[in-house]
Amino acid sequence: MLWARGRQPDHRIRMSQQTTIRKLAELVNTPVDKLLVQLAEAGMKFSGPDQVVTSTEKMKLLGFLRRTHGKADTPAEAASEAAKKITLNRRKLQEVTVNAGRTKTTVNVEVRQKRTYVKSDNEGSGRAAPMTPDEERADILAKLAASRQRNLDEQQRLAESDRARDEAIQRKRDEEQAAKDRVEAERKAAEEAAAAASAPAPVAAAPAPSSAPAARAPSSPSSAPRPARPAGASPASRPATPARPDDRNNAAKHKTRGSHVMVAGVEDDDATKRFAGQLHLSAADRARRSNVRGKPTGRPGSSSSRRNDGGRGSNQSNSGPHGFERPTAPVVREVAIGETITVADLAQKLALKGGDVVKALFKMGVMATITQSIDHDTAALVTEELGHKAVRADNADFEDALLAHAEDAQGETTSRPPVVTIMGHVDHGKTSLLDYIRRTKIASGEAGGITQHIGAYHVETGRGVISFLDTPGHAAFTSMRARGAKITDIVVLVVAADDGVMPQTKEAVAHAKAAGVPLIVAVNKIDKAGADPLRVKNELLAENVVAEDFGGDTQFIEVSAKVGTGVDTLLDAISLQAEVLELKAVADGRASGTVIESSLDKGRGPVATVLVQQGALKRGDYLVCGIQYGRVRALFDETGHQPASAGPSIPVQVLGLSGVPEAGDDFVVVDDERLAKDVAQQRETKRRESRLVASATNRMEDILAQMGKGEGQQVLNLVIKADVQGSVEALKQSLVALSNDDIRINVIHSGVGGITESDANSAAASKATIIGFNVRADASARKIVESNGIDLRYFSIIYDVIDQVKQVASGLLGVEIREEIIGIAQVRDVFRSSKFGAVAGCMIIEGVVKRSKPIRVLRDSVVVFEGELESLRRFKENVDEVRNGTECGIGVKAYNDVKAGDQIECFERIEVARTL
């Protein structure tokens, strides 16, 4: 550009003399080549820098450059540029209500809007010849006039629209006010008619106590008696008699002194109301102020809610019927109570003070503060105790609607694979049987050769797909077996032919019967020597499990998990039972099911093993699982593959939840993450409230228990971390069950995953022992454990955990002092000694009597003295002990009342270690 090097584009060029191109370039400080290019772009061709540039050519070049930079070359062009821009300004007044403390304040706000419209210059680009300046100016003026006319029309249209809207609003308000006035007039007419019908004869006014009030009485129209209005008279037919300020003052004075008696009748309030409004306000402002002033601030029947329309400070009386009547009977309220409620909320619903409810709870034996939550039963009892009625609150919220919608899954029902749970006693071959069916080696990889969590698999056989759940057989995993029986279709009870029915076998039968699930008995280890299938059938008869060949309906299949004998027959029995059950489910739509197991993987986060029962679970679905929620990031089957979806009766692992869910929780797929989060938070709130109520109850029971037992009970604190949720649950139940009157096992924290720094700090603060079941501590946790001397123990078999905790608890119990009788001597005669006093001549009839051991003197089998054996002699010789059948002399220290026929019992105190 010509003016690019720091110069303004409007520098003037001297045009009084002819100038060459080179000189012009020096003058404007621009290279010659660039100036030649700009001259060529302006339509002027020069052959060299020494040619002369005329003033006309300079002006032409200047105009070209100004147009290039967006500036008008001439005043006409400037006017044309200005004509292309139109600016509209608009002002609008409105009112905004803001909160100022307890009151609301109205603020006037002015909104200013400014818009600029620029007309494009595309229309003139296609014309062949440019217009003359006059024609261009006339055209621009015409367009400007048309634009102004359009703007005026638009403004007029907007003004008319605003006016019509305001008129409609005002008309609606007038109609509402007229309706209110009409209803008020009818109500007052009815009240006046009722008052006139029930009023006694008019009472004459009492004589004035002084002459001054008597002189003013005739001039005051309000003090003169007024005739009663007919019953059918309307308030609108009365004459308008505005009340003067002195009338109101006189009325106030008479009311204060009590010197006049009110005359039967109704005060004429309409005349005062007619002049109560402020005439200088608009209808909208008057309505707004009347709403603010007339808003009731107290209870119904209070003075603030009965304020009339006479304005501030009005002293007009109202002799109509009173708005509040004192109840003649106690008010019985119907109180809706949920699962939990705080004492303060209950007191508010009962319209009582919180202290009254707390007193009632104390009388019932419940100690609670005003902020403490109580359960529904306690709240219902105290409500009935206070004379009110308690009803259960309707908890029909969006969660119930969601679950109901999930149960009514859309789509056609199709046949689904059966879910088979394998149950039985420990080491009876459950996992080995499943290994043979799946052609895998799971049992060899289990710690200790026993299953310690639920395994979920689906197997494709020649008879169709079958889903298997392998449950632990150890006594500690009762809840796991109950959970497996709850979600299953068929229970396969594995019983070892050489071992027979064991305790967990009986428990599995009880779980199957409680769940109403058909039972198939697999008599395993049939290939071993000493196998007796008939014994198994006879023992199960005691549990009401009758075989088909005994006339019952339970199938007994003899199998061998080692060599595979009878496995095909077992699969045929499962398929036959599934056909009889006619298992069906919805294959499409929202998925729902149950969590079988859950764990925390360091690399993948929370992992939940779920069994789909309805619908199809796909990657990307939003699901709610107990108090956890999330989006399904990945699905894995038992082989580690990632299926696209999982249908009914298929177990899969789900990744993407917000936390580790509880085993046994139900899951359901929802539409979006927000709904899932709301449902999970509501469940968490309910669970927290229930936990607070339970903890408060347990805390009170602990206080009472400590008061009764004193401080003799020892407490062993534990922190339990395991690999899966089911193991945590089993460990807690088994270890807490070890508590007795002397020691209490207290699990202060438990969870899934590795031992973290937080777990170590909790153990250090409570002096607890950390138990890691198939998990390890990280570096930071190990550092805290070493610095604080925390007892950290790792386990992989649940037997070892229980045994070790028993040993630790036994160490806390200390030792027990026991007394063991070692010998009994019969007193035959008593001798006197100057040194020892009375000496008993005795015969040892049982055991051995030793010197310096404690003794008891028994007379007629009653202890009369307890002391120490001071002297033991035989043939005048001191001996250390005398055995059975030998005579001896015994000197009892500090006791001289020994008689013939007494028995001397010798015993010793020994320390015995206490165990659980």
UniProtKB/Swiss-Prot annotation:
According to the UniProt record, where is the region G3? 470-473
InterPro entries registered for this protein in UniProt: DNA-bd_dom_put_sf (IPR009061), EF-G-like_DII (IPR053905), EFTu-like_2 (IPR004161), IF2_assoc_dom_bac (IPR013575), IF2_II (IPR044145), IF2_N (IPR006847), P-loop_NTPase (IPR027417), Small_GTP-bd (IPR005225)
Report residue spans for region: G1: 424-431
Biased composition range(s): Basic and acidic residues: 151-191
Q: Which parts of the sequence bind GTP? A: 424-431, 470-474, 524-527
Q: Keywords for this entry?
A: Cytoplasm, GTP-binding, Initiation factor, Nucleotide-binding, Protein biosynthesis
Query: Do you know which PROSITE patterns this protein is assigned to?
Result: G_TR_2, IF2
Does the keyword section mention GTP-binding? yes
Q: Where is this region: G2?
A: 449-453
Q: Where is the tr-type G domain?
A: 415-584
Q: Where in the cell is it found?
A: Cytoplasm
Family listed: Belongs to the TRAFAC class translation factor GTPase superfamily. Classic translation factor GTPase family. IF-2 subfamily.
State the protein's purpose. One of the essential components for the initiation of protein synthesis. Protects formylmethionyl-tRNA from spontaneous hydrolysis and promotes its binding to the 30S ribosomal subunits. Also involved in the hydrolysis of GTP during the formation of the 70S ribosomal complex.
Q: What's this protein's name?
A: Translation initiation factor IF-2
Taxonomic source organism: Xanthomonas campestris pv. campestris (strain B100)
